[in-house]
């Protein structure tokens, strides 16, 4: 019997071709920080063609980046409506209030802060709020820390917001008024901090401090009992010193958020240099 051996050649199946292409594509992808040229390429492409399927967009734009990398770069940094710089007093108060209701639901919280991303808010909470709780030797989710926010820090933030709003009304200059840039939830939060009492808004810082001290003393007597080493009043004074490292007086000519010296922007003078700014956080991504 004559046997005919046929010479066959191996043709890669479609699955193998896709796998080889994926390996080649993965090897060509860029890693690490984005360059200015890459940013401009992504901005110009989206400006001309709009957003779409990010993997296809990355290839069409000629970017050697993953679709996920392009999406995060656009949403968290390059979008025209993304805000820059530190959070305003209104934004910080709103974050504290909404987090007390919804917890770590960053996307839901971000819906009430125009121009702020969920990733940015999460980084603020972790690098500012959680670090301050650690400085006070208490858990960020503990009743002790939540009481400090509710009865001391949030009312103080609300006072600064009202003081600035009054300064803007007196001067007639609304160019720096950020109240209109934040959801109406902010004003409801401010009102809740004052329990609807106009006298609370116009009272001096010392009067407000006395009222808050009495409220916090009642709360912490329940928490600490008869602990002689750290009674509620001593602890309240300790955290208040951390919150307002220096006394801040409203200035009608120039009332800017960077004057919020204490816990709101840097907790205390000794700690402010070790805390990351939003610019530093962006650079780390």
Curated annotation (Swiss-Prot):
PROSITE patterns: HTH_MYB. Keywords: DNA-binding, Nucleus, Plant defense, Repeat, Transcription, Transcription regulation. Disulfide bonds: none annotated. Probable transcription factor that may be involved in the jasmonate-dependent defense responses to the rice blast fungus Magnaporthe oryzae. Does not seem to function in the salicylic acid-dependent signaling pathway. The gene is JAMYB. It comes from Oryza sativa subsp. japonica. SMART domains: SANT. Induction: Induced by jasmonate (JA), wounding and infection by the fungal pathogen Magnaporthe oryzae. GO terms for cellular component: nucleus. This is Transcription factor JAMYB.
């Amino acid at each position: 019997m004559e046997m005919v051996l046929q010479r066959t050649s191996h043709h890669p199946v479609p699955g193998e071709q896709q796998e080889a292409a994926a390996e080649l594509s993965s090897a060509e992808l860029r890693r690490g920080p984005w360059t200015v040229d890459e940013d401009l390429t992504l901005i110009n492409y989206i400006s001309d063609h709009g957003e779409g399927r990010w993997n296809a967009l990355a290839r069409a734009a000629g970017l050697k980046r993953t679709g996920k990398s392009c999406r995060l770069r656009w949403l968290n940094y390059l979008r025209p409506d993304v805000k820059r710089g530190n959070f305003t007093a209104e934004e910080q108060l709103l974050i504290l209030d909404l987090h007390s209701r919804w917890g770590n639901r960053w996307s839901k919280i971000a819906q009430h802060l125009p121009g702020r991303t969920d990733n940015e808010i999460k980084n603020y909470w972790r690098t500012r709020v959680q670090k301050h709780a650690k400085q006070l030797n208490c858990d960020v989710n503990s009743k002790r820390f939540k009481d400090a926010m509710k009865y001391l820090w949030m009312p103080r933030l609300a006072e600064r917001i009202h003081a600035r709003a009054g300064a803007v009304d007196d001067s007639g200059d609304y160019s720096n008024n950020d109240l209109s840039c934040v959801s109406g939830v902010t004003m409801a939060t401010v009102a809740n901090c004052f329990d609807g009492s106009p006298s609370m808004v116009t009272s001096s810082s010392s009067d407000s401090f006395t009222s808050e001290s009495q409220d916090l003393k009642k709360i912490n007597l329940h928490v600490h009992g008869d602990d002689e080493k750290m009674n509620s009043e001593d602890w309240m004074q300790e955290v208040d010193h951390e919150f307002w490292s220096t006394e801040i007086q409203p200035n009608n000519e120039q009332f800017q958020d960077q004057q919020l010296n204490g816990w709101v922007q840097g907790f205390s003078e000794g700690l402010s240099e070790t805390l990351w700014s939003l610019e530093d956080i962006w650079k780390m991504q």
